[in-house]
């Protein structure tokens, strides 16, 4: 089996004991299976939930708190306890762990996004196992990543993973709720996430988790768009993750055919960047960009909206108002208003620029 880069996401429901806390037995089971992946020569990143579950009892809560401040307080206590438990277990296998706590803003700010990419790459090069969680104790919005399902998809794209394994307490995707319908049909393989499949996933998670199957399906769709195949399911024992790679996992495989990965800068533009303005273009420019993969030139620009600076991301729309994509603009809004509609030779004659693309094709994402 060739060496692969694997992202494994373990949700709260796959870590919890009967009292809603963290089960040492389950955690040990997961660690043993992750160590087997490493033993087989694979690079492994772990996305783990469970900070709230690990910390609420230490603060005297009788059960998992329901308020945002209660969850964040429990996460602040539980994250260190959770990391300590993982570190002690991985040490038995001689594996060095590293902790990364991320929020949405770490993805939306390009410098932080690039730093996360560089740090993860270096950790993997040094054979460490990164353990990643949302920074629940300071996140501004409740349940930002949906029990880390979307976080796992975004990280898998960031590191160009070969596979994302989302482990939960349900053994895959069904056409209806298997707990309520005996005739529920299980999907063993889905080539893609269609609107029909997305609509079948329920909204509610388990009592212990926050994601539910809908967030897992959404995460799978995002991962596929980034060139990463996905497995959603469950399992026990030391071989469970290796079995997934062998096609023997207890769950649903989604899009396991080779996918074209999206470059890091385009991932940031497509999924994380904040749009600072809009550019309207003519039909010829739209055809050149979408059908022929060309860069956007000033000659094709017909209107500029907003007040953006050089390097900020803008949406691009047709004269009929249809948004066709977005990209990083090499002009400020003021500069672009001054040169819109001009041919490159005209701009060159003014002696103001040596870079004539408004948006270079390497910094463009089509919708």
Swiss-Prot record:
The protein's superkingdom reads: Bacteria
Name the positions where substrate binds: 49, 136, 148
Q: Name one GO molecular function term.
A: glutamate 5-kinase activity
* Compartment(s): Cytoplasm
Which positions fall inside the PUA domain?
276-350
- Keywords linked to the UniProt accession: Amino-acid biosynthesis, ATP-binding, Cytoplasm, Kinase, Nucleotide-binding, Proline biosynthesis, Transferase
Please name the top-level EC class of this enzyme.
transferase
PANTHER family (UniProt xref): GLUTAMATE 5-KINASE, ISOPENTENYL PHOSPHATE KINASE
Q: Which family does it belong to?
A: Belongs to the glutamate 5-kinase family.
Query: Can you say what this protein is called?
Result: Glutamate 5-kinase
Species in which this protein is naturally found: Bacillus anthracis
Q: What is the lineage of its organism?
A: Bacteria, Bacillati, Bacillota, Bacilli, Bacillales
């Amino acid at each position: 089996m060739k060496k692969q880069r694997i992202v494994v996401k373990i949700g709260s429901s796959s870590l919890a004991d009967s009292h809603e806390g963290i089960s040492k037995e389950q955690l040990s089971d997961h660690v043993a299976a992750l160590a087997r992946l490493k033993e087989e020569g694979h690079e492994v990143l772990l996305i783990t939930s469970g900070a709230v579950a690990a910390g609420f009892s230490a603060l005297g809560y009788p059960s998992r708190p329901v308020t945002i401040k209660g969850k964040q307080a429990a996460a602040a206590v539980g994250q260190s306890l959770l990391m300590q438990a993982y570190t002690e277990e991985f040490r038995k296998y001689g594996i060095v762990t590293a902790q990364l706590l991320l929020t949405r803003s770490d993805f939306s700010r390009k410098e932080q996004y690039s730093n996360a990419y560089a740090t993860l790459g270096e950790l993997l090069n040094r054979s460490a196992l990164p353990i990643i969680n949302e920074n629940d104790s300071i996140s501004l919005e409740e349940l930002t990543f949906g029990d880390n399902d979307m976080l796992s998809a975004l990280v898998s794209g960031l590191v160009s993973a070969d596979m994302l394994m989302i482990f939960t307490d349900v053994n895959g995707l069904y056409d209806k709720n298997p707990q309520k319908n005996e005739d529920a049909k299980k999907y063993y393989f889905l080539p893609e996430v269609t609107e029909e499949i997305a609509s079948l996933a329920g909204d509610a998670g388990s009592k212990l988790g926050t994601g539910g199957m809908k967030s897992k399906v959404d995460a799978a769709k995002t991962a596929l768009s980034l060139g990463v195949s996905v497995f959603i399911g469950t399992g026990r024992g030391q071989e469970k993750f290796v079995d997934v790679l062998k096609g023997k996992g207890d769950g649903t495989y989604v899009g396991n055919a080779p996918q074209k990965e999206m470059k890091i800068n385009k991932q940031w533009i497509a999924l994380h960047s904040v749009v600072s303005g809009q550019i309207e273009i003519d039909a010829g420019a739209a055809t050149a960009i979408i059908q022929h993969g060309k860069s956007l030139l000033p000659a094709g620009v017909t209107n500029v909206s907003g007040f953006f600076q050089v390097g900020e991301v803008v949406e691009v729309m047709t004269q009929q108002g249809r948004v066709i994509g977005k990209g990083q603009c090499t002009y400020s809004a003021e500069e672009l208003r001054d040169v819109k509609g001009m041919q490159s030779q005209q701009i060159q004659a003014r002696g103001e620029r040596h870079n004539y693309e408004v948006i270079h094709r390497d910094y463009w994402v089509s919708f």
